[in-house]
């Protein structure tokens, strides 16, 4: 089953009949329009390409305009692709709504996390700080040793150090689907999802469900 592209609206909470409060993220999933269908013969794999939302005409490049015109759909704010499983069929120009998730219990949500800028090891990797006193005057928040000796004589790849924090692709898995509101194109999932309000999100049925 393919996924859909939506927009993060924000967080709120809803109450069950028992009065239990459930924190939910509201995702607006406008109709996803099929712009291209890829097949084994021409592309070597089966996939469907979709767009959603709208883009100002003066922001659409000529190649994009041609691509959307060929598909017969309105220019959207981006292009996304989902692999097709055996038996799944879609046609160019088809519109896919949030009702796709009507019978789905759990989803995986992918987005771009909020950027935090250049961060030290304490903030970025939750390192412990060093002594506040007892002879320590300048090294309270430094990481300490980052390697060994002449052997191996290098810093290993992946070593946790200071650097850019956030603003990276993140996937949160197995979030419960609380409600599917097809009338208002809304999907409510339990808990938080990556990214700032208004960012694009890719919602797929959970792989571990």
Curated annotation (Swiss-Prot):
UniProt GO BP: translation
Residues with PTM N5-methylglutamine: 150
InterPro entries per the UniProt record, alphabetical: Ribosomal_uL3, Ribosomal_uL3_bac/org-type, Ribosomal_uL3_CS, Transl_B-barrel_sf
Pfam families: Ribosomal_L3 (PF00297)
Record PTM text: Methylated by PrmB.
Coiled coil segments of this chain: none
GO function terms (MF aspect): rRNA binding; structural constituent of ribosome
Subunit structure: Part of the 50S ribosomal subunit. Forms a cluster with proteins L14 and L19.
Family according to the record: Belongs to the universal ribosomal protein uL3 family.
PANTHER family the record matches: 50S RIBOSOMAL PROTEIN L3, LARGE RIBOSOMAL SUBUNIT PROTEIN UL3C
Protein's recorded name: Large ribosomal subunit protein uL3
Protein's gene: rplC
């Amino acid at each position: 089953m393919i996924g859909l592209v939506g927009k993060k609206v924000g967080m709120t909470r809803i109450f069950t009949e028992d009065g239990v409060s459930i924190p939910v993220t509201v995702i607006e999933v406008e109709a996803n329009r099929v712009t291209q269908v890829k097949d084994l013969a021409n592309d070597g794999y089966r996939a469907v390409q979709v767009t959603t939302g709208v883009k100002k005409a003066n922001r659409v490049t000529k190649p994009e305009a041609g691509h959307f015109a060929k598909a017969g759909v309105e220019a959207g704010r981006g292009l996304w692709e989902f692999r097709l499983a055996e038996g799944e069929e879609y046609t160019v120009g088809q519109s896919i709504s949030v009702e796709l998730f009507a019978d789905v219990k759990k989803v995986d949500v992918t987005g771009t996390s909020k950027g935090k800028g250049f961060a030290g090891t304490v903030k970025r990797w939750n390192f412990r700080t060093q002594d506040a006193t007892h002879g320590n005057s300048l090294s309270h928040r430094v990481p300490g040793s980052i390697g060994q000796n002449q052997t191996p004589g290098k810093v290993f790849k992946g070593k946790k150090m200071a650097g850019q924090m956030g603003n990276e692709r993140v996937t949160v898995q197995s979030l419960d689907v609380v409600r599917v509101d097809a009338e208002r194109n809304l999907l409510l999932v339990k808990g938080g999802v990556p990214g700032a309000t208004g960012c694009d999100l890719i919602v797929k049925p959970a792989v571990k469900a």
